[in-house]
């Protein structure tokens, strides 16, 4: 089977794929254009794409050889799944591959913002740090604050667990459907306005796509308190 992998992977993953398939691994950092996606599906039995590769409706043309798009990542909004199905091409994804890593990054961003870590690093790299001062780069506490999770899916739950168990934070969340049987205390709120007005930190953990585009705009930002972060 001929397989195209659209980005570099870890050495172990590349070795495993090459040992099993006739594998071509693209050495690039930008995504495939629609024309390149169409050409890949015409030449290969399977393609392993990821975010940024444009498998939009126009890429699914007559006479394609490809029968599988094995997406690397949970999100697949860069693939027109309806067009793929019409062309007889199966689409798979990896729902839990990056759940924990994404939640770690969310907590990293919360801590960096609250404790002004980015500012401190830039100060140090500029050679301007002259020693500790009582009021230097004062941030705010994270422990005991309220976090609002927008989207309580796998990633949202992983973020909420870290916030509650790691920092004793109160957890609010907004989700399009009712979420129950959580293994940590949390309160679901009906609207974004209610969540944002009560949150010290708000985290967006929803899939990308037309349904969530512009979810956060001027109105939502104005609901945040003067010392809140999103």
Positions of PLM-derived features:
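Residues at secondary-structure transition points
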Residues: 32-35, 50, 71, 93-104, ...
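Short glycine-centered segments of the SAM/dcSAM-binding site in methyltransferase folds
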Residues: 68, 201, 229
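Rossmann-fold dehydrogenase core element
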Residues: 85-97, 225-229
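An N-terminal-biased, well-structured beta-alpha scaffold segment characteristic
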Residues: 1-92, 197, 217
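Short, flexible loop segments at the rims of nucleotide/cofactor-binding pockets, characterized by
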Residues: 23-30, 46-49, 126, 178-185, ...
């Amino acid at each position: 089977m001929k397989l195209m992998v659209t980005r570099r992977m870890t050495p172990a993953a590349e070795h495993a794929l090459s040992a099993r398939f006739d594998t071509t691994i693209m050495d690039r950092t930008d995504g495939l254009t629609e024309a390149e996606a169409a050409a890949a599906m015409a030449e290969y039995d399977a393609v392993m794409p990821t975010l940024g590769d444009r498998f939009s409706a126009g890429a699914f043309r007559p006479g394609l050889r490809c029968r599988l798009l094995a997406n690397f990542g949970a999100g697949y909004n860069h693939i027109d799944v309806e067009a793929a199905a019409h062309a007889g091409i199966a689409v798979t994804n990896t729902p839990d591959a990056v759940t924990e890593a994404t939640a770690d990054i969310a907590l990293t961003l919360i801590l960096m913002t609250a404790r002004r870590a980015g500012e401190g690093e830039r100060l140090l790299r500029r050679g301007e740090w002259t020693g500790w001062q009582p009021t230097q780069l004062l941030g705010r506490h994270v422990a005991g604050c309220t976090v609002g999770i927008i989207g309580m899916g796998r990633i949202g739950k992983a973020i909420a667990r870290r916030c509650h168990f790691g920092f004793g934070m109160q957890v609010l969340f907004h989700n399009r459907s009712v979420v129950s049987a959580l293994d940590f205390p949390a309160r679901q709120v009906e609207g974004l306005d209610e969540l944002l007005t009560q949150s010290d930190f708000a985290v967006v953990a929803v899939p990308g796509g037309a349904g969530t585009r512009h979810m956060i705009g001027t109105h939502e930002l104005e609901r945040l308190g003067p010392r809140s972060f999103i």
